[in-house]
């Protein structure tokens, strides 16, 4: 038995098969949508997943203004940020955040960012996420595939062919 023939394949920037996918966020719960999008960005459904490399897909989220929260989280959930100055802790609810310019994009990017690694790779992966409030996006040249995020399961993530 030749054990030298068993090589572990690690994906890198050149060998990663990155695709463009479109996810419709209409009537999706924010946390569940963010979790599945983070897995798509990370590439965890791919057989050549490598933890230290960007081998995930580029994800376009459309209809970000139609997401929903369960319960009364629109008004009860609080997002905190700190300005860096004494007494500079600011809080904002999702309802207040959605009223701001590009609030839909900021909300979903913040949710997905919390589910990615807290290092340089996580920042790079977040750059592969594009969020749009309406149904139009500017990435038609990349010919993205439209996927149903509900059909993407936790145990076996698959993309339609």
Q: Where are each of the predicted segments found?
A:
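Basic side chains
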Residues: 18, 44, 81, 110-113, ...
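Conserved small/polar residues in nucleotide/adenosyl-binding loops
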Residues: 155-161
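Ribosome large-subunit tunnel/peptidyl-transferase-proximal elements
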Residues: 2-84, 89-106, 144-151
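Histidine (H) residue identity feature
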Residues: 17, 52, 137-139, 156
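Positively charged, low-complexity, intrinsically disordered RNA-binding extensions
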Residues: 107-151
